Amino acid sequence: MDYTVLDNSALFSGIPTKELCNDLNTVPHHIQRYDKGETIFHLMENASRIGIVLEGNVQAQKPFPNGSQINVSVRKAGELIGAAAAFSRSQKYPCDVVALESATIMFFLREDILLLLQKDLRIMKNFISELATASFMLQQRLELLSYNGIAQKAAFYLLIQARQSGKNVIKIPGSVSNWAMIMNVSRSSLHRELKKLEADGLIAYAPPVIEIHDFDALQNVLSK
């Protein structure tokens, strides 16, 4: 395999390709392809595997008995899937993970990822950082989903991104359709609310970016 595809993975940040290749060649793993819509991990399945997305985008989805579903997160190439579940007390996947398009995943068994972490302290530090980041992002995700209005969800997302980046120009995550999916709303409804925010002078809506014009007014949207 061409391991250069992992150069952009946060898990292997700071590790030269040659060293990474040597590490991976001594630890069992396998690579599997999935078609669009195919399930990678099933809800409450034994979390014995950890994956790294090599190609494509995958989504964690939380289904409910009444037929509704929450789109929890999207993972793209270079990102981990299943890591927190594999090392949790329950060792069960809390969501379905589904391929949004053709996807390729590198899998490690839980015991084998531990071997990899022991081999290279840099990978261990990166792994801990990834778990902490995922936990922080989940907290933000839960807060976003706590808002009922679409304008509130959009305002919260834009303000969080602006605070983290220190910029007032925010890049839309992938596309408006993808952004809508992340926020669990329809594309048309999100587009309509963004146009309203633009008409009110709060933002400039010009996909693939949005420029925030009035931070205070956008903050006030959250309390409506």
Q: At which residue positions do the language-model features occur?
A:
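Cyclic-nucleotide recognition modules
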Residues: 71-129
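A short beta-strand-loop-beta hairpin characteristic of the jelly-roll/cupin
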Residues: 58-71
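Short phosphate-coordinating micro-motif centered on Lys-Gly-acidic
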Residues: 39-45
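Phosphate-/nucleic-acid-contacting segments
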Residues: 161-224
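Glycine- and acidic-residue-biased ligand/ion/polar-headgroup-sensing regions
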Residues: 37, 48-61, 77-78
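Short, small/polar residue-rich loop motifs at catalytic or cofactor-binding pockets
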Residues: 26-27, 45-47
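Cyclic nucleotide-binding regulatory module and flanking cytosolic helices
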Residues: 1-36, 81, 85-88
